[in-house]
Amino acid sequence: MYSNKPSRKPHTFQFRGKQLQASDSLFFIIALLCLLPIISSPVALILGFTLASFGFVPTKLNIAAATKKLLAYSIIGLGFGIHLDQAIAASTQGFGLIVGSIFFTLIFGWFLTKALRLDQKTGHLIASGTAICGGSAIAAVAPAINARDDQTSLALATVFVLNSIALFIFPAIGHLLEMSQHAFGTWAAIAIHDTSSVVGAAGAYGDEALRTATTIKLARALWIVPIAFLSALLFKGDNKKIGIPYFILFYCLAIVFAHFVPSLESIYSHIFVASKRLLVVCLFLIGSGITIQKLRAAGLKPLLLGVLLWVAIGVGSLSYILLNVA
């Protein structure tokens, strides 16, 4: 016997003119929670990946376009947290080692990407993250080369895995080799991807190591600007015009503005903190663009590339530092 009762339609709601399912609200709730300090960058990426794998990501929203805009805003905001005088001073410390390690990593990464037959943009993002400052570099370079969310997610996942490992093994290696505070701080700043892991590893080693690592890491992070422009040039394809990442220009302007208008320091600090949280939201959105099926399709090549680059820069910089840095 068939029932004459009408079937219950799923609850829906409107968002910017789009008809969304009530189940999609979980996606927005977690996105908002990413603004709180209780969720770290790796956790945000994993949450996005988990929702995507279980089909809880709204399909009617252009999440990729929103992510690109939010990434630009967050990178610009981070510029207000960098002091120009500190940036200039940091650039003079270990300049040769910083420049050499960055370009070695990018060039070696290019050859390895070719050898492994890995997607060019994914390989370049992993190399950029290894060469400069992990997730922040990947977030800045990705829109400059018009990388897809799955390419960005694979690069971020690779870097975050290696970051977690570095946090534990670097201090152990430093103590085993009886490295000085200054030498270890230099090594951590050169060979560890993300600033958070650099600070964590160096802080565990000692106060002097932390000061050295923070200063050199800042100088390394400043290379986000030229590398983003270089990346846009390399991946312009058949287009005659280069896709200039204008947010990088505003990032530089934010640094300069904060320097010449110091009276607004309290506001800058709030903008900087808010931008860091917005970056976490972006990582959640990026994670929502990749599923288990996409990871299986990519295979182990992205992780293998990340490990090979990391070992090369880690061993190479360690050898140089042990021979030349007191």
From Swiss-Prot:
The keyword Transmembrane applies. GO terms for cellular component: plasma membrane. Its main location: membrane. It is found in: Cell membrane. It is a multi-pass membrane protein. InterPro entries: UPF0324_pro. Keywords: Cell membrane, Membrane, Transmembrane, Transmembrane helix. It holds the Pfam family Cons_hypoth698. The chain crosses the membrane at residues 27-49, 70-89, 94-116, 123-145, 155-177, 184-206, 216-235, 242-261, 271-290, 303-325. PANTHER family: INNER MEMBRANE PROTEIN YEIH-RELATED, UPF0324 MEMBRANE PROTEIN FN0533. Belongs to the UPF0324 family. This is UPF0324 membrane protein PBPRB0970.
